[in-house]
Amino acid sequence: MALAALSFTSCKSDLLDTNPTDQVSGDTMLKTTDGGYMALNGMIRYFWQWGQTTTGNYHQCFGPQSYNLMADLMGEDMVMSAQGSGWFWFDYLYNVKSRWNSTAWRSYDTWNYYYTIISNANYIINGKEGMTGSTEDIDYIIGNAYAFRAYSYAYCAMIFARSYIGHEDRLSIPIYTEPTFAGTAGKARSTNREVFAQAMSDINEAISLLGTKAQKHCSHFDQYVANGLKARIALYMGDYQTAHDAAAIAVKGGSFAFNKDFHYNDATDKSVLWGAEIIQAQGTTNPQFLAHMDIRYNNGGGYGGKARKCASAWLYNKMAPNDARTKWWNYETLQDNTTKGYQQWKFLFADPANTYTGADHIFMRAPEMQLIIAETACRLGNESEAKAALNELMKTRQEGYDCSSKTGTALGKLTTDETGSLLEEIILQRRIELWGEYGRVYDIKRLRQGFKRTADMGHPVAALLNNLHTDDPETFDWVLTFPSKEVDANKLILQNPTGSYPTNEDLEGDDPSKAPKTE
C-alpha cells in the first residue's frame, strides 16, 4: 500500500501526517478518550483542509466539496462557462484520467484522500480495546471512525469503479480494515459487492455505537447523519427499502423548509444535518468551495468570476416561474461580456470581502433525505407516499405544486429523454434541489442512464464531449484511473482504462478474471 502509517495530531495543529514524526504517536494518543477525540477531530479537518493530498493543483483539492464539484461538472446540469484559472476545467473536459502518473492530478489526489481517511479510521477503531474513559465517549469516538470509513469506501468506489447496479461483481477498490504502515503489502481490488458490503457493515456499526448520543459538533456523525449516509449508500446500491428507512430517520434531524436567505455558508442552518463551521483561524482565500462559486469574490476577479458556474438552460427551464429556487440562478452576461447564461447565486460567501468566516462547509441537508424517501417509496410501489413526500417538500418552494397526476417509474435512456413518470419528476426535483451539492455523475451512474451535452444547454464547444461515450452506462468515462504510485507499489492492482473502454482487457478494466494473481 502506498500510504504510510499515520501519527495523530491535535486538530488545532497541522493535519494528520502521513509520514512518521516525533509528535505523539497514534498508539499513545489512543490510550485515552481525550486523545481519541484529538485523533477524531484531526481526521475531520481533512474534510476542509487543502493542499494535503497532492504535490500541486492545491486549489482544487479541498475535501468532499471539491470532489462533489468535480462530479457535478462531469455531468450535464452544471455549465462551466470558461477555463478561468484552470481549476476544475480539466474535470469538466474529462481530461484527467491520462495523468495518472502525476502526483498533482485527480487520480492521486482522490486516492490519497480517501485512503488517508481510511487509514486514520483504522487506527482509531483498532485503539478501542486499549482506550480508557467512559463507555459513552469510547462508543462515540469509535462510532464516528466507523462512519468516516464507511463514507470513504463508498465514495472512493463511486469514483474508481463503475456503478454498483449492473457491476456488482466487477472489480472496485481494495479493502483495508487493519492499521497500515509504510511497506504494508498491497491488496487486490475487491468487487463492488464486497466494498459496499464493507461500507454498509461499517455504517451499521456506527449507528449501533452512536445510538441516540447528541452530536458534539456539526462535523461529527450522530444517528441522523449516520442514517443519512446509510441512505445514500443503500440508494446507490439499489437497496431501496434500506435507503427509505434510513432516510426517514435522518430527515428528522433537520428542516426542509425553504430559506431564501440561505446561501450555503452557515453550517448552523436548520436544514443542515452535517457540515463544518470554519472559524477565522481555519479560514482561507482561494482554495475553498465558495471561492470557485461566488462571482463577487475579489471583485469578480476570483475563480468564481473567471470561470462562472451556471445551470444548464435545459434544467433551469424545467422550473416553474413561481419556483422560489429560480432565484438560485440569474440569466445574465458572463465573463466574456457577450455570452449569457444562468449564473449561480445559490452559493455565496456571507461577506465576499472576508473569506475567512461565513464560509462554512455543508456536507448533508435534510431536503436530500426527503427526496430519497420520495424516490424509494416510488420504486417500492408506494406511489401515494412518494407523492405526499414530494408535495410536502415542494409546497415550501413552489406554491400550488402538485405531482398527484404522475405515475410510474420509467426513465429515459438519456437524462433528457422524458417519459413523464413520477420517478422522473422526483429525480428532476433532486437535480434542481441538490445542484452543486451532490456530485451529479454519481446519480447518472446509479440510474443507469447516459447524457449528452449541447451548446443549447450553455456548454462551451470545447466541453461537448463528442469523442466520449457518456450516453452509455457501461462506459469507463466516469471511472478514474489508479495513480501510478499505487500501481507501482501494489502489483495486484488491475488498472482502469484511460479511455471509454478497455483496449486490452488483460491489462486494464474491471474483469475479476484478469486481475493479477498473488505470487
Give the residues covered by each predicted segment.
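Short, surface-exposed recognition loops and adjoining beta-strand edges that mediate ligand/DNA contacts
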Residues: T21-L30, T54-G75, F160-D169, I173, ...
